[in-house]
């Protein structure tokens, strides 16, 4: 029986990588073709008879595989010609990929669920006032409102970077997918980015001709974001200051956004019933977020001596506290809709909060079934942020 020895060539150019850069297993590439029934004969460089074949493996193939090999060789040559003929496209794609990857890393770094929360506050408060005063709408106003988001997002981004820089060891246990832990971004780059972000927010705040009060609030917010994570102050290591800062950030941001909204629209700052309701509701919700954010971090916090309410109560008890307080918040909201129909739109108040309460009960049950593991606990925390966004959406129409 006629046999042919076919070896896999290994040139300086690694063709199987060029043809498929994501192929982690070269044995599956075109250059490692093996007939399903063909045995592989191991050989060393010393024993191999040809000086041109550099691999240690060669395949003993029957003549009936000749057509497959020829077809394979043509495919390799065609792929090689295509690769060699498009160096500029590779360069362009490489630059574009790096930019996209850096943007994605920054997005992960600034905690997407918090960014969405900041945007929901601004859009909810601004949207309600504009909804009730449609005659004030203008594209110039919308453009100004868009730029007003920059200081808010800058403050959040700065605080997130500081927190992750000084929590790298803890996050290796609690959140190994974060950019600084996984190595997607270096600590040096994170520091440079934090300075750029803080200065950008300050410049935009001044350029918007904001009142001195708002400039002071922004500067204080940057200081609070720094003091929250950076030793020796590190407010987050003390349960009371950790709790107080978290609540203050939510309530203070709502107050600041409402004040900026009324100022931009030329409206007086009035404590209307709806605004009083959302401030009270978000004060309670800020408490639940302050508690819930530590449930998934219990293991890492306990290992590094960070004392939180969650580490003292445990994941199960902490989850019931969070869910219980939030359910009470929803029941009070439903009661307000029933008692004061002349002030609030009762149908929206009752129905929306009943639906959100049901969703909360369902998610609490799902976490219990998952035995309060770290990953499901983190998903539960992000679900509470979904409830946060939803409340500001409901606020527009109550």
UniProtKB/Swiss-Prot annotation:
User: What does UniProt give as GO cellular component?
Assistant: chloroplast membrane
On whether Chloroplast is a keyword of this UniProt record, the answer is: yes
Q: Which Gene3D superfamilies is this protein grouped with? A: UbiA prenyltransferase
> Might you give the EC number(s) for this enzyme?
2.5.1.102
* Transit peptide (first-last residue): 1-77
Which pathway does this chain act in? Secondary metabolite biosynthesis; terpenoid biosynthesis
Catalytic reactions on record: olivetolate + (2E)-geranyl diphosphate = cannabigerolate + diphosphate
Q: How does activity depend on pH?
A: Optimum pH is 7.
Q: What keywords sit in the KW lines?
A: Chloroplast, Membrane, Plastid, Transferase, Transit peptide, Transmembrane, Transmembrane helix
Q: Which cofactor does it need?
A: Mg(2+)
Tell me, which GO biological process terms does this entry list? cannabinoid biosynthetic process; terpenoid biosynthetic process
| Compartment(s) | Plastid, Chloroplast membrane
InterPro entries documented for this protein: UbiA_prenyltransferase, UbiA_sf
Q: Which residues form a coiled coil?
A: none
Q: Which domain of life is it from?
A: Eukaryota
Expression by tissue, per the entry, reads: Expressed in young expanding leaves.
From the Swiss-Prot or TrEMBL record, what is one GO molecular function term?
transferase activity, transferring alkyl or aryl (other than methyl) groups
- According to Swiss-Prot or TrEMBL, what is its membrane topology? Multi-pass membrane protein
The family note in this entry says:
Belongs to the UbiA prenyltransferase family.
Tell me, what does this protein do in biology? Aromatic prenyltransferase involved in the biosynthesis of cannabinoids-related terpenophenolic natural products, which have pharmacological activity. Catalyzes the transfer of geranyl diphosphate (GDP, GPP) to olivetolate to produce cannabigerolate (CBGA).
Q: What is this protein called?
A: Geranylpyrophosphate:olivetolate geranyltransferase, chloroplastic
| Gene for this chain | GOT
